[in-house]
A protein has these predicted regions:
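Short alpha-helix within the catalytic core of nucleotide-sugar-dependent glycosyltransferases
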Residues: 35, 197-198
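Active-site loop immediately N-terminal to the catalytic Tyr-X3-Lys motif
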Residues: 101, 189-193
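N-terminal Rossmann-like NAD(P)+-binding domain of SDR-like oxidoreductases, especially those catalyzing
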Residues: 1-185
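A conserved pocket-lining segment of Rossmann-fold NAD(P)-dependent short-chain dehydrogenase/reductase
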Residues: 97, 177-189, 199-214
Length: 214
């Protein structure tokens, strides 16, 4: 299968790439702007070839294309002949979305739209969207998928918009979309993350007091 993974140099992307490589028979094209993940992160997971935008051609092994999800022409080019798009690239976290709501909206809404459009134009049949628990907002437990969303942050709103576009592209264009609401993902290679779980692990390893606010 031919896979496109946006944000593939991040923690979840690297974990997915390792799993796919272990299965063999997969070609993987990573699109990343390298603001969080790095070439070194990808190299520690696998051997890859970096391909310039002008040299994108047929899928071949693991490739890295350095670029921005807001580049709609690049999205169409990257997704050509893909079997599935895994859209992980995003502006992550509530804090940054409050500091710069416009940047959050552009990355998480327009960036997602660009790759759904790339899927539609290139007849890519499957699209997986990395969402978050943030669209649910502040609700009383038990929490389940059928609860009406009530986002309380720009980040939650932008991820909810992405979910809405995925639903629309499934109903309108028959793209098989899947939305995954990740929450505090952790595992090997995640200690650099700013999530509460990664912070607790770092504090525990350093024999520090675990701080809980609220």
């Amino acid at each position: 299968m031919n896979w496109v993974i946006t944000g593939g140099c991040g923690f979840i992307g690297i974990s997915l790439i390792k799993a796919l490589i272990s299965e063999n028979n997969h070609n993987i094209r990573v699109l990343d702007n390298l603001t969080t993940g790095t070439r070194k992160d990808l190299l520690e997971a696998c051997k890859y070839a970096e391909v310039s935008v002008g040299d994108i051609d047929e899928f071949n092994g693991v490739e890295l294309v350095v670029g921005d999800i807001l580049d709609e022409e690049l999205a169409i080019k990257v997704a050509r002949n893909a079997d599935v798009i895994i859209h992980l690239a995003a502006n992550t976290g509530v804090g940054p979305s409050v500091e710069n709501p416009r940047a959050d909206c552009m990355a998480n809404v327009i960036g997602t739209f660009n790759y759904l459009e790339a899927a539609r134009i290139n007849n890519v049949p499957r699209f997986v969207f990395a969402s978050s628990g943030a669209p649910a907002g502040e609700v009383d437990p038990p929490i389940h998928e059928e609860l009406p969303p009530h986002p309380v942050s720009p980040y939650g709103a932008s991820k909810l918009a992405g979910e809405g576009y995925c639903s629309a592209y499934y109903k309108t264009f028959n793209i098989q979309t899947v939305m995954l609401r990740f929450g505090n993902v952790y595992g090997p290679g995640s200690l650099h993350k700013s999530s509460i779980v990664a912070k607790f692990i770092r504090q525990a390893l350093n024999k520090e007091t675990l701080e809980i606010y609220g």
